[in-house]
């Protein structure tokens, strides 16, 4: 099992008040699944993504990622998990504007201290997987929105993560580019990548396999 969350609560302190965001969330995901978590604005999707992505910790409950108890991890251990086990894809791409597509995809490998030759080979392979072998030297302002998101996906998969975590990945794209990105996620999942997508868009859920989605609701 790649993910297991039991009795997850999350609250934030605002002055003297504690504001609940997640309440008794239970969720599990097997390796190789493609699942969408769907919910309206304000339902806690981003908070849940931050917990699953090891960017934040729950207030109560247990969370295991690939068998590791995340709440027991130090900040350095969580950083290593983010680098080596999770690939992130965001709505706004988060590409370095002055760097080429190749350099953007190489970035996680720099942090992992991968040798230069191997770094380039792996980044080129990732760009080829997303259909951008002919755009390796292009900078973000020379790419379409759909191409920028594919660069971001290549960056997310270059470290061969256990989990690909996508937060509203088509939110900034037109319908055609969005459909192409969703088809790419589907192909990556067919190749064995575990994909967890967080969305409010019912149309994107149709691309997921087997167990279609879990729904978050307002507290």
Predicted regions and their residues:
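ABC family nucleotide-binding domain
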Residues: 2-207, 211
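Single conserved hydrophobic/aromatic residue that forms the stacking wall/gate
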Residues: 209, 214-219
């Amino acid at each position: 099992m790649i993910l297991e969350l039991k009795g997850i609560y999350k609250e934030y302190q605002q002055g003297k008040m504690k504001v609940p965001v997640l309440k008794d969330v239970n969720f599990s995901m097997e390796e190789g699944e493609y699942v969408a978590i769907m919910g309206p604005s304000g339902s806690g999707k981003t908070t849940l993504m931050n917990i699953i992505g090891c960017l934040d910790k729950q207030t109560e409950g247990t969370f295991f990622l690939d068998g590791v108890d995340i709440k027991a991890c130090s900040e350095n251990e969580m950083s290593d998990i983010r680098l080596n086990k999770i690939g992130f894809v965001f709505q706004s791409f988060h590409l370095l504007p002055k760097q080429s597509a190749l350099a953007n995809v190489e970035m996680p490998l720099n942090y992992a201290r991968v040798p230069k030759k191997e770094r380039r080979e792996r980044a080129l392979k990732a760009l080829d997987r997303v259909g951008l072998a002919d755009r390796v030297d292009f900078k973000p302002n020379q790419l379409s929105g759909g191409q920028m998101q594919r660069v971001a996906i290549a960056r997310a998969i270059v470290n061969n993560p256990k989990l690909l975590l996508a937060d509203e990945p088509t939110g900034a794209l037109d319908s055609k580019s969005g459909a192409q990105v969703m088809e790419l996620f589907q192909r990556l999942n067919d190749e064995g990548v575990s994909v967890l997508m967080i969305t409010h868009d019912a149309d994107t859920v149709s691309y997921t396999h087997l167990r279609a989605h879990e729904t978050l609701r307002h507290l």
